[in-house]
Regions:
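Extracellular/periplasmic, surface-exposed regions of secreted and cell-surface proteins
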Residues: 1-183
Length: 183
């Protein structure tokens, strides 16, 4: 089993239902890591309810477009799911006595990497909520760009080392796209 200790905080602010602001932060520590046990993962978002502005309320367009809210957010998430409970502490195997000259023996069954870190996914999202005819028809459009650094993966090793692989933070993954929701 493993242990995790986390703290989480959130601050939300809105001014007159027009300008929206949110800040979140998470601080995690986990026993699956050794030298880099703690991770800080913040996020921020802002939005603007354009339809709450007087210039919008007083215009003819507000009769057709009943909701208009551009928004943007950026956040960091952490992940350590690729690490076993004891990967950073070492694992040992037992050689059966009949295979080792009549005596039992212990051996390292895996290489240890105490420098493993949290995977970090950094996500930027830009979106627009728009509704027509008192929101009888509405769209939510989002563009996202996510980059994950320090991917937890096993790196193959040459056979003469006596081990097939070692767990490392190696690699980067980028995902991006557009999402459209129609209601």
């Amino acid at each position: 089993a493993y242990r995790i200790l986390s703290s989480f905080g959130r601050i939300n602010y809105n001014y007159d239902m027009k300008y929206l602001f949110s800040f979140v932060a998470r601080y995690d520590g986990i026993s699956r890591l050794k030298d880099n046990r703690w991770g800080f993962f913040p996020g921020i978002s802002v939005g603007w309810n354009v339809m709450e502005e007087n210039f919008w309320k007083d215009s003819k367009i507000s009769e057709v477009i009943s909701n208009l809210k551009p928004r943007i957010s950026y956040g960091v998430n952490g992940n350590v799911n690729g690490i076993g409970n004891f990967d950073v502490y070492g694992a040992y195997g037992l050689v059966d006595a009949k295979n080792y000259g009549g005596s039992s023996a212990f051996y390292n069954s895996a290489l240890v990497n105490t420098g493993l870190r949290w995977e970090q996914s950094k996500t930027l999202e830009v979106g627009l909520d728009i509704g027509f005819f008192n929101n009888k028809l509405s769209f939510i459009i989002d563009y996202f760009n996510r980059r994950t650094n320090d991917l937890l993966t096993k790196q193959a090793l040459p056979g003469y080392l006596g081990f097939s692989d070692i767990m490392t933070n190696m690699g980067t993954l980028r995902n991006s796209g557009i999402e459209l929701e129609v209601k």
